[in-house]
Design a protein with these regions (language model features):
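Short beta-strand elements
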Residues: 523-551
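Glycoside hydrolase catalytic-domain context in secreted enzymes
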Residues: 1-501, 505-522, 555-997
């Protein structure tokens, strides 16, 4: 019997399902491949392996040194503001304490957002244990059980009322503070340390209400009578209790922001208070060392601490409530249906927003001291004092010490002299430690310029110079020198307010008074502490004193390059600006909640093709691309002689030959895909490089290769120590290289315009000079390490009003812009060799800062002579942050993020290509210039091992993996198709056989 062959049966359902699934898989894989291809440069930056020639031992050694430095910053940045009866330092044999306050179990190392730290490895409690202090765990366990950490620590993914929640059980609630617990605590120790904590951060300003949880798992209680920056009633009750029941009571302020602390003075039994700031990931180790006197708290306040924050001239126009809403703005950004990318869930923008800087130049001490000089506070009287003393608790620059100092002005030769246009005023002060403990002191020199009512606005005092001593042993002295360039005292007169026919920087004739002070208010009692100089005739500075370039109005009236006056005078903003001539009549009591948007402002809401075409200049010449000149700036990641040469001189003639080698594709890729690093440029030998965010911790924001978390920038500013700032910058730069980074999205030097700004912890101070010096030295240190910085945010990112911060219109006078907000950046460019800046999310007047020709070209390049690169902030809002606009306005790099992108408007004109070539040159100069600085620094210290460059090598062949997945998907699809085809053939064959049968 012949065996019949097995008949193959079709499986149409199975193969049909297989085909559908394979099609879905293939489409998904192909779409994924396309998306990944658009992000290739960014992916390379994030997953590339660092290559910087560092051994594991060197990396470990840097980490140890960085942690020690962080502790130094924390100690020197801690400000002793109260110390009744010399309660501090605590006795060496008093090593048992009670730690009160829920915030003691949620110690803040940083704020939230890009300036935060990725984790707090050493918090207060861990630091106490490491120091050998026993604390009452019954209390801290209760706090942890009440609320285990903050529910919302990331402000970028939370609302202000969530991230700003205040947790504290009431001391009178025996559900938490049982009688036995309180009795045990008093038996445990007669010393109480109370921790007060506050958290604000990126995207969330501090709230002007309190959102509290006072019951475990309970509902949120809203207190509309107190702001987040005041003590809660529960904290006040706690302080009253410990003040009445403990022999030694110390309050620690662990806050991102200035607070109202009047009760610290008035509640009986509160002995001492330390402003500890934010300690970073490790710096809290210094806190017990300060408490017990192993370290001296030599910090000074970097801001004014007022008893009532509503007395600030910026209050009405700050925070969420200070933001106004334009009417008649339907369809404009961001009220065009755009959702807020900062939150986990989409939220549609409800309004087109604005903020008025109606306070003008009068922020911080410049307001409080000038108001005092004008008698504005004379009628004030309360439990704290009368006049100024009833208003200001801790002046700018204030701080106590564990020891005492005596000052003697040793050189006041300038007294009685006539000032000269290009001269300096120098004062020398001998500082002697007259106490019985070692310590450091800070000497501050202020000036008072002549003022005429109704003319140029001027503060009654302004910081001109400062110096911090070394650590002085008892009886030891040091002479410090303070120098104020005469030109630094010039005011910017945008309106010819003094009627001399000149607009620009100028000095009025009259007496200039210099005072040696302990803070912005307290003049030293030395007989020579006040020095008077005269200026017989007014002086005008028509040119920038550093560059010699012409200076003129760029934002005012008909001179406004961007088309609308920054002060709002030609767009019906109708802003009343605070004037010293009439403080009472012009003090901003409320903001303007709504106003109509005029057509000239509407026209600049979006960037259009017509505007792009308007940049075309037919006279612009064609550029050369793809030339084979054989020039290389790097060889296998190492800088060539040509690279060093070009990095030394932006105007070197060899630049043209190098740039001629680049292709348009290379230049566009470098410009468009700048998030996370600078692209490889094969034609000139440039390797791909990585940049990282994190002003306090390199890579900390993304968690990719994080270095040591340093104390917040405001804590660093409280050190008043330029050398310490430079060492921090150099250390962060070194850790950047060790983690494969060559660029740093930091530091940040916006102003503490208001105590409610969510990112004040990330910025330095309310004062422009202190901000510029501390930030500038940080930049210098990073440059010395060979890492370029993108100092941010250029300009006026001084509020984080939640969903309204993106594209918010900011209005002010050009004097305010230049003297207050631009001044630190000008110092960085002209004095500290900064070669990278980052623009901001907001608008400066009517135009986005990253697309403002007046800002990026008119002032930055044409006046200050800046040759480096300007990168945009993260561009997740393309409808108003336009890469074409940024390039044409003077920007250099587009932080397109993971969305990639391409030029939306014309990209073929000679004008466009010239702009692209310029931007490429600026980015390459920035990249190379810090390598020159690094080499020169290594030569100066005689250590050639200090010359290190980071570049990125492939650690993971992700393109090959993607290709393999593509192949697998195609094969599976082919097999599925084959199965269906076979099924069709089998079914046809079966039908034929059946028919024949």
């Amino acid at each position: 019997m012949t065996k019949q062959p097995k008949v193959r049966k079709p499986h149409p359902v199975l193969h049909g399902i297989g085909l559908v699934l394979s099609v879905i898989l293939l489409v998904a894989v192909l779409v994924g491949t396309y998306v990944l291809s658009t992000m290739a440069t960014i992916i390379d930056s994030f997953i590339g392996a660092p290559s910087g020639h560092y051994s594991d031992a060197e990396i470990a050694d840097t980490k140890v040194k960085a942690e020690a430095l962080a502790a130094d910053v924390e100690a020197e940045g801690t400000v002793l503001v109260q110390n009744n009866d010399n309660t501090l330092p605590l006795a060496a044999d008093n090593k048992k304490i009670n730690v009160f306050g829920w915030a003691s179990t949620a110690w803040l190392g940083g704020g939230s957002g890009s300036g935060g730290v990725s984790g707090v490895n050493t918090d207060l409690l861990a630091a106490l244990t490491a120091y050998g202090v026993a604390y009452n765990t019954e209390l801290t366990d209760m706090y942890k059980d009440f609320q285990d950490g903050r529910e919302y620590i990331r402000t970028l993914s939370a609302w202000p009322e969530q991230s700003g929640r205040l947790y504290e059980p009431d001391i009178n609630n025996q559900t938490y503070y049982t009688q036995s617990m309180l009795d045990n605590a008093k038996s445990f120790s007669d010393t109480a340390v109370v921790v007060i904590g506050r958290l604000a951060g990126e995207s969330n300003d501090a709230t002007k209400q309190q959102y509290k949880r006072i019951e475990k798992g309970g509902d949120i209680v809203v207190d509309d009578t107190r702001t987040m920056l005041e003590l809660t009633t529960e904290e006040e009750n706690l302080l009253n209790y410990v003040g009445a029941n403990y022999a030694h009571v110390v309050v620690l302020i662990n806050s991102t922001n200035v607070m109202e602390l009047g009760q610290i003075e008035t509640i009986p039994g509160i002995d001492a208070c330390l402003i500890a700031g934010l300690s970073g990931s490790e710096g809290a180790t210094a806190v017990p060392e300060v408490l017990w006197g192993d370290r001296e708290p030599s910090g000074r306040t970097a801001d004014t601490w007022a008893y009532d924050l509503t007395t600030a001239a910026s209050y009405a126009n700050a925070g969420l409530e200070g933001v106004g809403k334009y009417s008649a703005a339907d369809g404009l950004y961001p009220a065009d249906g755009t959702t807020n990318g900062n939150l986990d869930t989409p939220y549609t923008y409800e309004q087109v927003s604005y903020v008025d800087y109606a306070e003008g130049i009068y922020i911080g001490y410049k307001w409080y001291e000038t108001a005092d000089a004008e008698g504005y506070w004379d009628a004030e009287s309360n439990e704290h004092g009368t006049g100024y003393d009833a208003v200001v608790q801790y002046p700018f620059g204030y701080g106590l010490s564990y020891t005492s100092f005596d000052w003697k002005v040793t050189d006041a030769a300038a007294n009685g002299s006539a000032l000269t246009k290009d001269g300096n005023v120098t004062v020398k002060v001998a500082v002697t430690n007259t106490g019985d403990r070692a310590g450091k002191d800070v000497v501050q020199l202020y000036y008072t310029a002549p003022y005429t009512a109704g003319e140029i606005e001027k503060s009654s005092v302004e910081l001109g110079a400062f110096a911090k001593t070394k650590e002085l042993a008892p009886g030891e002295s040091e002479e410090v020198t303070l120098t104020v360039p005469v030109s630094d005292m010039a005011s910017y007169d945008a309106y010819d307010a003094n009627h001399n026919g000149f607009t620009g920087y100028e000095l009025d004739a009259g007496d200039y008074i210099f005072t040696v002070r302990h803070d912005a208010h307290d003049v030293d009692d030395d007989a020579n502490a006040t020095i008077t100089c005269s200026l017989p005739a007014g002086v005008q500075y028509a040119e920038d004193t550093a560059t010699g370039n012409a200076v003129s109005n760029k934002f005012t009236g008909s001179d406004a390059i961007d088309g609308v006056s920054l002060d709002g005078s030609d767009s019906d903003q109708n802003i009343t600006y605070l004037t010293r001539a009439d403080f009472a009549g012009t003090f901003p009591k409320t903001n303007t909640p709504t106003r109509a948007m005029t057509d000239n402002v509407k026209a600049l809401n979006f960037y259009t093709a017509d505007e792009a075409n308007g940049w075309i200049n037919d006279a612009d010449e064609a550029i050369t691309t793809g030339a084979k000149n054989g020039l290389k700036i790097e060889d296998n990641g190492e800088t060539t002689d040509l690279g060093f040469r070009l990095g030394s001189d932006f105007n070197d003639p060899q630049w043209d030959a190098l740039l001629d080698q680049l292709t348009v594709d290379e230049m566009e890729n470098l410009y468009i895909n700048a998030y996370g690093g600078l692209a490889e440029l094969k034609s000139v030998g440039k390797s791909k490089s990585k940049d990282a965010d994190g002003p306090a911790q390199i890579g900390g924001f993304t968690g990719m290769g994080a270095g040591t978390g340093f104390p917040g920038s405001s804590t660093l500013a409280q050190t008043w120590n330029a050398d310490l700032a430079q060492e921090e910058g150099r250390t962060i730069g070194t850790q950047a290289l060790q983690n494969g980074y060559t660029g740093w999205y930091a530091p940040a030097t916006n102003m503490h315009r208001s105590p409610f700004n969510g990112r004040n912890y990330e910025y330095y101070s309310e004062d422009s000079l202190l901000s510029g010096v501390i930030c500038g030295n940080t930049v210098t240190g990073a440059n010395q390490a060979g890492v370029y910085t993108y100092v941010k945010h250029f300009i006026c990112n001084d509020g984080e009003s939640g969903i309204y911060r993106d594209s918010v219109y900011t209005w002010m006078t050009e004097q305010t812009l230049r003297e207050t907000y631009l001044r630190p950046f000008q110092m960085l460019v002209e004095d500290y060799d900064a070669v990278g800046l980052m623009s901001s999310y907001n608008r400066i007047g009517a135009v986005w800062t990253g697309g403002s020709e007046a800002l990026l070209t008119g002032i930055l390049r044409d006046e200050w002579g800046f040759d480096g690169a300007v990168i945009t902030d993260y561009c997740d809002h393309h409808s108003y942050m336009n890469g074409d606009q940024a390039l044409r306005a003077g920007g250099s790099l587009w932080m397109a993020g993971f969305t990639g992108g391409e030029m939306a408007f014309e990209a073929g004109s000679n004008s466009y290509l010239q702009a692209l070539r310029r931007a490429t040159k600026e980015a390459l100069y920035m990249y190379l210039h810090v390598r020159v600085t690094n080499r020169d620094y290594a030569d100066n210290i005689g250590d050639t091992t200090a010359v290190r460059h980071a570049f990125t090598t492939s650690v993971f062949g992700w393109r090959h993996l993607v290709a393999l997945i593509d192949i697998v998907a195609v094969v599976l699809f082919a097999l599925a198709v084959r199965g269906v085809v076979i099924d069709v053939k089998l079914r046809k064959a079966a039908k034929t056989e059946k028919k024949n049968f």
